Amino acid sequence: MADTSGVRQEKVTVVSGNEGLKDYSVVAGSFGVKANAEGLKDWLDGQGYHSTIAFNADKAMYRVIVNSFADKTAAAEARDAFKAKYPNRSDFQGAWLLYRVY
């Protein structure tokens, strides 16, 4: 059973990527500089993901989202699978769940 605790609620706007965001998203990285977020998005897309960049204006941070789900449990399982797929990427071990608020 995936751990569904530790969900952060944020108001975000999609700035790159054509995948629509659902309620729960797996965030692989956060950047203050858009170009850095775009670099990770490009790398993830090259790995077969359809990643999205969302901007949190309150925190002035770009969130790189690996995938998005309507269901919290499915999102937590996807986050855990993402972390397990890249055990040597310490930056990915901090992947977290974002709950989109409007």
Language-model-derived ranges and their functions:
Residues A2-K22, G32-Y102:
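Extracytoplasmic
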